[in-house]
């Protein structure tokens, strides 16, 4: 376990070095660190902006740069899977999260570009875009409110997200994809 702020290059460097020391290679990265701030756009502060960019973007960039360099040296390809958000593609009225979505949406756009840039080296970039997941983060919303967030009327589990990550990590011919795990919320209004 590494203690540190993933938005700092030094932390990413420690993670990378430990992975290589412990496993001998880096074959897959799951960039799961992220924060989500819900408030009206005009209420975001400079501190909110810095925190969102540091964790959601810099946290992805630093660890991914180091992992890609290692994968290139290994010449065996690899997989980078990031966690974004279904709200990027289908915002929900009453859940103002524009600054969070700017960082997550930027991450999705960057993944597609990286998938193209590193395809010839068989380094794949994909994302899982969860909707509402049954975690303590959503425990105060109430079961009925949460179930209305998807047309299936269900809530994703941590296992649902993990299964999607495993699929994208192992699917050798899949790159540049955003896999929505949101009970159909990304398909639009229902």
Residues of each region from the PLM?
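C-terminal substrate-recognition "lid" of short-chain dehydrogenase/reductases
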Residues: 123, 158-181, 186
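Catalytic loop of short-chain dehydrogenase/reductase
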Residues: 81-106, 111-120
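A short, exposed helix-loop element centered on a Lys and neighboring polar residues
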Residues: 64-65, 112
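Substrate-binding pocket helix/loop in short-chain dehydrogenase/reductase
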Residues: 40-41, 48-53, 146
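The beta1-alpha1 cofactor-binding region of Rossmann-like NAD(H)/NADP(H)-dependent oxidoreductases
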Residues: 4-14, 46, 159-160
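Conserved NAD(P)H cofactor-binding loop of Rossmann-fold oxidoreductase domains
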Residues: 32-37, 184
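Active-site loop of short-chain dehydrogenase/reductase
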Residues: 25-27, 71-86, 120-123, 177
């Amino acid at each position: 376990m590494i203690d540190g702020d993933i938005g700092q290059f030094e932390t990413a460097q420690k993670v990378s070095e430990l992975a290589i020391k412990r496993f001998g290679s880096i074959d897959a990265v799951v960039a799961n660190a992220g924060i989500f701030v819900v408030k009206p756009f005009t209420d975001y502060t400079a501190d909110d902006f810095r925190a969102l960019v540091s964790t959601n973007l810099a946290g992805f960039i630093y660890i991914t740069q180091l992992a890609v360099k290692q994968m290139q040296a290994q010449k065996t390809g690899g997989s980078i899977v990031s966690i974004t958000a279904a709200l990027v593609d289908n915002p929900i009225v009453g859940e103002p999260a524009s600054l969070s979505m700017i960082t997550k949406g930027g991450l999705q756009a960057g993944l597609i570009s990286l998938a193209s840039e590193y395809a010839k080296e068989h380094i794949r970039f994909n994302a899982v875009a969860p909707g509402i997941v049954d975690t303590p983060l959503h425990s105060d919303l109430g079961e009925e409110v949460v179930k209305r967030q998807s047309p299936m009327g269900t809530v994703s589990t941590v296992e649902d997200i993990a299964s999607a990550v495993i699929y994208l990590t192992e699917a050798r011919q899949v790159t540049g994809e955003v896999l929505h795990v949101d009970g159909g919320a990304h398909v639009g209004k229902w």
